[in-house]
Every structure is written in structure tokens, then in C-alpha cells.
């Protein structure tokens, strides 16, 4: 659990902002949303597999688009 020490004379809003940032870094809210409802093991595997496929397709798309960038043009034929 993230903790934040409030300094003497510090604005409570700044302390709250630091606490929210530390919670975000720790991933508490995402974990809470994930555990809000029970997910069957098969559904969890299916979701993870779909996420892996999506990451893979995104990586392939990035690789293909970077190859089409400047400097990778076809040479003109001089015939």
C-alpha cells in the first residue's frame, strides 16, 4: 500500500496528488478493476491470448511501417 507523508504546512491537495500518483505506479486501480468480478480460468486464458495476438499484430504493423520509411525507396531503373 503506498504511503505519503504530509509535510508540515504542505497543501493537502499536493499530498493527495502524490498519493494518487504512487497508487497509479503501484497499479492498484487496474488490479482492483480486474478483480472486481470473478473471471473463469478459461475466460482469463482467452483474454490473455487475445491480448498477446493484439500485441503481436501491433508489433508487426510497426515493423512494416518502419520499413516503408524514408531511405527505403526503390531505385529508379536507368534503362
UniProtKB/Swiss-Prot annotation:
Domain of life, source organism: Bacteria
Entry-linked Gene3D superfamilies: Ribosomal protein S8
One term of GO molecular function: structural constituent of ribosome
Keywords from the named record: Ribonucleoprotein, Ribosomal protein
Stretch list, region Disordered: 47-79
PROSITE patterns: RIBOSOMAL_S21 (PS01181)
Gene Ontology BP terms: translation
Any single GO CC term annotated in Swiss-Prot or TrEMBL for this entry: ribonucleoprotein complex
Ribosomal protein recorded as keyword: yes
Similarity comment: Belongs to the bacterial ribosomal protein bS21 family.
PANTHER family, per the entry: MITOCHONDRIAL 28S RIBOSOMAL PROTEIN S21 (PTHR21109), SMALL RIBOSOMAL SUBUNIT PROTEIN BS21 (PTHR21109:SF22)
Official protein name in the record: Small ribosomal subunit protein bS21
Organism: Legionella pneumophila subsp. pneumophila (strain Philadelphia 1 / ATCC 33152 / DSM 7513)
Gene from which the chain derives: rpsU
Amino acid at each position: 500500500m503506498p504511503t505519503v507523508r504530509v509535510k508540515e504546512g504542505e497543501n493537502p491537495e499536493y499530498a493527495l496528488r502524490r498519493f494518487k500518483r504512487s497508487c497509479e505506479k503501484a497499479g492498484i486501480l487496474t488490479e482492483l478493476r480486474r478483480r472486481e468480478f470473478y473471471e473463469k480460468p478459461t475466460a482469463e486464458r482467452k483474454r490473455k491470448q487475445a491480448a498477446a495476438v493484439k500485441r503481436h499484430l501491433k508489433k508487426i504493423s510497426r515493423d512494416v511501417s518502419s520499413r516503408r520509411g524514408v531511405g527505403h525507396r526503390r531505385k529508379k531503373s536507368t534503362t
